[in-house]
Amino acid sequence: MDFDLSPDHELIRRTVREFAEGEVAPVAEELDRCKAFPYEIVAQLGKLNLMGIPFPEEYGGGGGDSLAYALAVEELARVDSSVAITLCAHTSLGTQPIYLFGSEEQKREWLPRLCSGEQLGAFGLTEPEAGSDAGNTRTRARPLDGEWVIDGAKQFITNAGTEISGVVCITAVTSDSDEAGGESGEGGAGGRKAGEATARAHPGAGNAGAGKEISNILVPNGTPGYEQGEPYRKMGWNASDTRPLSFTDCHVPEENLLGPRGQGFKQFLHILDIGRIGVAAMGVGLAQGALDEALKYAKERRAFGKPISKFQAIQGKLADMSTEIAAARLLVHKAALEKDAGRNFTLTAAQAKLKTGRLAVRCAEEAVQIHGGYGFIEEYPVCRFYRDAKILTIGEGTDEVQQMVIARALGA
């Protein structure tokens, strides 16, 4: 078992770390304070070929793997979670569905623009009555004269309302009733096989469990009837784009269906697994950033005639943070390697997501505590880290959902 990164992976990590420290960190506090989307940073990420890391070069991607992607996300989250989630949601949720389940025509149309960072992709799953219970989707799409007519609403959607947002992949009920249905058949590259392997380990898996025929449909920005609401006022991730979406008599061509009709539930379960690797990497990155700031401050801050880093109580906090981060990082890497090996990674991805979200919250809290009063001041990064951490136990599946997924995978 080799725990060393390959030269290519080391290069990715070093490149993104230098970019994050040199370009992102200096503006992170201002972007957060102004709630300004990081357009210039996204453009630079595109030029560095980081907006499409795990996709083939033939579609404009970086030709990397899931581990390379996780390393990049971690390094960005180490200095700013808003930039990290922008890349993460774009790659795992916005672009992956098209690559995995799209037709060759859909891939040729969308992937080059998404992988270059020219446009952002989004994934519209969550609804007012369909969060953890994603099978309770109420958005409907009915076929009419060679089109899909969509009506419904989504909420908490990332990347859908920026000036460079290009397309959102939404889940919608495509049956005339709420009875389960759906055609068989192959999706894109390994789509149906991957979805079915994943579905078995999830609560409510399969369209029969959801009780509805759910399909995924691509809706380009600018389509009449598709509107993006005002961005939410959030606790954290203030420089990322998060808003509700509405669809009113929204017409898209029938060929915008992603994969076979009725396979949407299985598809998005697989997409969520992939997304959990990215969000878990964010948790490791935020925790590492909190440790970095805490250690730096502890070595500079003096009390009772010596740096507070010399006090056993502070050393214990730093040691525990470091140890937990090292263990969590290995779990994230294991999930990424399992995915790249073509193995079922549902269990490991859920474990990584559960572990790292909780770890990020604890490390951010400890970092604030070590900073004392300064940890409560916005100019110090740990204050932002503290606000950004909590969502990592909620987004991409709550901790409680991860526990359900893990227990089911264990056969409980």
What are these regions (language model features)?
Residues 207, 222-251:
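Flexible, small-/acidic-enriched active-site or ligand-binding loops
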Residues 151-227:
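A short core secondary-structure module
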Residues 117-125, 170-171:
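A short, Trp-centered hydrophobic/proline-enriched beta-strand micro-motif
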Residues 95-101, 123, 135, 177:
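Flexible, glycine-rich active-site loops centered on histidine and acidic residues
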Residues 1-79, 83, 89, 101-106, ...:
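Alpha-helical interface subdomain recognition
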Residues 138-140:
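Short, surface-exposed charged micro-motifs
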Residues 75-76, 102, 125-128, 144-146, ...:
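Fold-independent oxyanion-binding glycine-rich loops
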Residues 129-132, 158-163, 207-209, 234-241:
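Short Gly/Pro-enriched turn/cap motifs at secondary-structure boundaries
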